[in-house]
Structure formats: structure tokens, C-alpha cells
């Protein structure tokens, strides 16, 4: 009887070890290039994905245009989240994307943002940028950052660009533009709503949402790249974005998602 019980426990222990080993053996690591407006929310999405699948997601954040150039040059990313749809579509046309993997996951928004100690009256909207006290206005570099292009478009549509262009300072991406304001190196910034919606940032400053009529829609796309074709996890991570709880999380961070 004792021998039978001992053998049973050994069998159970062996099965548990095997299950853990097999899961570890199957686990994959994917490398993700992501636009920096996703800096907070994508980390949460990746954590949920890792918990459910046992796979690992390593994310590099930066500007969409820089990642586009790197991927064209052979950078070993498996998934690319862009802050627009043009860069993923261009990669698709170049044959660098897994067929059918493109997904327009959200649309972003831009806001005026200042630190709490700022005396600027944000209720005035973009016209507050005309104040003489505003010496530096941070935006993402419009040459390779979609949020930077949206900021310029908003300034042009409100006839403010010529007035303030000499005071613009550029971050390499939207996260760096945010940091310029957060560290006091700029007085105000035109940045992504998704960054100021992060719990860690909500108490550090104030924001004014810029009318979406003042800039083109910031439609954002993701693709699984051909370099990740041997990793089923790459495509699975893209599909994970379509789940209702992930869509709800994106909306919580200020994104618009055209899904029911």
C-alpha cells in the first residue's frame, strides 16, 4: 500500500515536472518595435499575454519612422506597432510582412500638456501658445513621428504655426517630447493623450484635448513581420489585440477603437 502510494506521488511529481518543462520548451520570445505613444498601455497588454501564454514579449519603444527604416534594413523585430498605417502598409508592399497580419488597432489623440505648477490657462486651447511666457513648445519630430505631424497640422489649421514655429523643440518621438515638458525643458507640449492617461502620469500635470477637427486622424496599425514567421507567438500577439478586454484597455488610455 505504502509502495503504491509512493509510486503514485512520484508519477504525479514527474508529470508536473514534465508539464513545466514542456511549457518552458515551447515558450517563445518575440521582439516588438512599438511607437512610443504605447509606452504604458502596451506593457500592460504584454503582461497579460505573457501570463496567459507563458511566452515572452520584449518591447523597444521609439518613433515609427525610425523603426520603419530599421526594419527595412533588416532589424530583427517580429512585430511592428506604428503610430500610423502608412509605415506598416509600406512594409507590406515591400514583402516584409506576414500576409494578412495587418490590423488597424486604434486611433490616437493629441493634447496640450503642462506640469501642475504651470500658470498657463489651458481652457484657452491652442491660443495659449501665443503667450509671451511660452518660450518652448515640445512636439515629436514631424519628420518621422506621426504625432509630430499631427501637432504641426493642428497648429497650421488654427493659423498658429507661423507664430510659434521658432519656439518649437523636438523630441525624437512623442515620449521624448513628453519628457521635455515633464523635466522643465519645455513650457508646454503637444503630446499623445495615451501618455497622460497613464496612472503614473495623471497626477503630474494638466491637459487640454485638442479638437480632432484640427488634425488628420492618427490611425495606427500593427503587423507581424516575416522575420517572425517561424514564431507563431508573433501572429498570436497581434490577434490578442482584438479581444474585448484589450480593446477596453486601449480605450481606457484614450485611444479610439472602432470595434464593438
Language-model-detected regions and their locations in the chain:
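Exported/periplasmic ABC-transporter solute-binding proteins
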Residues: 27-54, 58-61, 65, 69-75, ...
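Bacterial Sec-dependent signal peptides at the C-terminal "C-region" and cleavage site
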Residues: 21-27
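N-terminal secretory signal peptides that target proteins for export/translocation
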Residues: 1-7
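Bacterial N-terminal signal peptides
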Residues: 10-21
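Short linear sequence motif anchored by a di-proline
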Residues: 8-10, 26
Amino acid at each position: 500500500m505504502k509502495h503504491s502510494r509512493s509510486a503514485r506521488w512520484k508519477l504525479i511529481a514527474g508529470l508536473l515536472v514534465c508539464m513545466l518543462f514542456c511549457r518552458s520548451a515551447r515558450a517563445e520570445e518575440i521582439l516588438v518595435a512599438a511607437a512610443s505613444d504605447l509606452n504604458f498601455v502596451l506593457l500592460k497588454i504584454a503582461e497579460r499575454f505573457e501570463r496567459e501564454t507563458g511566452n515572452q514579449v520584449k518591447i523597444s519603444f521609439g518613433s515609427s519612422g525610425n523603426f520603419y527604416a530599421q526594419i527595412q534594413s533588416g532589424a530583427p523585430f517580429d512585430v511592428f506597432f506604428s503610430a500610423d498605417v502608412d509605415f506598416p502598409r509600406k512594409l507590406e508592399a515591400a514583402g516584409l510582412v506576414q500576409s494578412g497580419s495587418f490590423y488597424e488597432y486604434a486611433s490616437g489623440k493629441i493634447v496640450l500638456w503642462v506640469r501642475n505648477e504651470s500658470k498657463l490657462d489651458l481652457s484657452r486651447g491652442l491660443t495659449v501658445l501665443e503667450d509671451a511666457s511660452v518660450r518652448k513648445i515640445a512636439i515629436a519630430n514631424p519628420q518621422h513621428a506621426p504625432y509630430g505631424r499631427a501637432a504641426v497640422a493642428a497648429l497650421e489649421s488654427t493659423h498658429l504655426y507661423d507664430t510659434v514655429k521658432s519656439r518649437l523643440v523636438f523630441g525624437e518621438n512623442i515620449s521624448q517630447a513628453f519628457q521635455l515638458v515633464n523635466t522643465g525643458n519645455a513650457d508646454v507640449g503637444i503630446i499623445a493623450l495615451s501618455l497622460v492617461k497613464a496612472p503614473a502620469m495623471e497626477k503630474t500635470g494638466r491637459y487640454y484635448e485638442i479638437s480632432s477637427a484640427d488634425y488628420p486622424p492618427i490611425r495606427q496599425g500593427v503587423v507581424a513581420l516575416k522575420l517572425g514567421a517561424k514564431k507563431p507567438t508573433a501572429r498570436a500577439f497581434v490577434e490578442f489585440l482584438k479581444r474585448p478586454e484589450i480593446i477596453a484597455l486601449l480605450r481606457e488610455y484614450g485611444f479610439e477603437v472602432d470595434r464593438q
